[in-house]
Amino acid sequence: NSEVKYSTVQNWYSGDENGKGGIYNFVTKRGLCAESNSKISWTQVETGSAITWKYPSCILAGNNSKGEFYSVALTNHYQQADTGSKMIHIGKNSRSKIISKGISTGNSINSYRGKVKVSLNASRARNYSQCDSLLIGNSSEANTFPYIEVYNRSSIIEHEASISKINEEKLFYFMQRGISIEEAISLIVSGFCKEVFTELPLEFALEADKLLGLKLEGSVG
């Protein structure tokens, strides 16, 4: 019945507006749910570094074990983020959940890359994955690369992906009510990320929300 919750907010130097300089952020995080009813939950907010590769993994070996992954990745200027999760189901009745929110602006590229694998003996395993991308401006890019392997017919795998854009109509709605464009974008992004922020400790969630607002300054216009 053990539980581990690991939360990070990353804001390494991302380079200048022309994409020069910046930290390369390559991270390895793995967790093993070895016994029954164990749980691992990864929560991360990525706003910095020039290039980020990050794929926290859960090996769900115990029966009734659970793995969760909640992520927000914001890229601006010439940043590149390739993030996601791996959920490996081995135990019976194991459960996993993946919630990924990607925001792309400037000339940046933001990609979700995840793997869900259900082994032959993982009867009645279940996974739910939701990958949402938000584009700001006309030069940014968002991608989703799901990899799903299922070897047990009693398992249930659900995957949803969406890409949307902050259009002029939405911004005009806010401006009619006396809200500036930058503040409007910040509010829209904050609502977009709410599902992940609620999984962070309160002080982390407040700082992450402010950090995204600062990173988005000047993203339009």
Swiss-Prot record:
Its main location: plastid. It is found in: Plastid, Chloroplast. GO terms for biological process: iron-sulfur cluster assembly. Keywords: Chloroplast, Plastid. SUPFAM superfamilies: Stabilizer of iron transporter SufD. Pfam families: SUFBD_core (PF01458). The keyword Transit peptide does not apply. InterPro entries: Fe-S_cluster_assembly_SufBD, SUF_FeS_clus_asmbl_SufBD_core, SUF_FeS_clus_asmbl_SufBD_sf. GO terms for cellular component: chloroplast. PANTHER family: FES CLUSTER ASSEMBLY PROTEIN SUF (PTHR30508), UPF0051 PROTEIN ABCI8, CHLOROPLASTIC-RELATED (PTHR30508:SF1). Belongs to the iron-sulfur cluster assembly SufBD family. This is Iron-sulfur cluster assembly SufBD family protein ycf24. It comes from Galdieria sulphuraria. The gene is ycf24.
